[in-house]
Amino acid sequence: MSEPLRLFLSEEVARGIRAHGAESYPNEACGAMLGVDGERREVRALFPLVNRRDDSPRNRFAVTAEDVRAAERAGAEQGLELIGWYHSHPDHPARPSDFDREHAWPWYSYVIVAVGEGKPREMYSWRLADDRSHYLPEELPAEVSAPPAG
């Protein structure tokens, strides 16, 4: 049996994802996750992006090729690499949609935070299977996946 997939991130990084989701509500927030992928995959910095989706920003997000290049440059300047993406699901669970799966790439981590009525809720991470047929759950530290207290 293979080891479960894991993504490590600090409470500070988790707060950043949740804050971006709350600030962007009722639209989806999105951003890049910069970090390392060696002995363990760890997010060390966020690179918030503007949701460039004009037609349905409440339930979709889009980034441009220039956004991707900017995130990669920012990571390189810090000795980090682009290891994944985060986005919010306003008034929906933190589970990937079919649209998310159709527009995702294998290897990357995808963190989704649910934002209900403007308040961040649970947060989960996923990786797309190599055959693109489904997502594989990726464990987050327990202290960051649960909804924030209060």
Where on the chain are the PLM-derived regions?
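Conserved beta-strand-loop surface patch within small alpha/beta domains used
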Residues: 1-82, 90-150
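Conserved, mostly hydrophobic/aromatic
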Residues: 85
